[in-house]
Amino acid sequence: RRVLFRSADTVEVYEAPIDAMSGASLKIIQHTGNWRGVHYLALGGTDYAALDAFLTYYPNITHIVLCLDNDEAGRTRTQDIIKHLDGSGKTVEDRQPPIGKDYNDTLVQVTQEYQKHCISLDDILEEETR
């Protein structure tokens, strides 16, 4: 059995599990990187105790990508975490959602946009019967 994530040196941090799954899905859909090449962590809100515990358990992490929500609480907590990790020797990146409040909103919007440009199987079958 292979352990996929042990050697990853990057963690992407989200507020909610659905956002972490959406972030991974966006990597797959948009071909923006190896979705298995990073750890995904959901804080269950904006408290960063889970991040501290994760970093203790995975000391090899050198790159932290903060993907918190695009609202006041998410933006404030992002700045708090950046200050908290200052001097840790880790690279901290703020990657707020490009569309909507969170990464699930982004995934929904991207998926809807892709669907506008796709031909459905029903359309193909209907075209063949004409």
What are these regions (language model features)?
Residues 3-4:
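Short, small-residue-biased leader/transition segments that mark boundaries at the very start
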Residues 11-13:
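Conserved beta-strand elements of the Class I
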Residues 7-8, 61:
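Short, high-confidence coil segments that cap the C-terminus of an alpha-helix
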Residues 15-18:
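Helix N-cap/beta->alpha junction signal
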Residues 25-130:
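TOPRIM fold recognition
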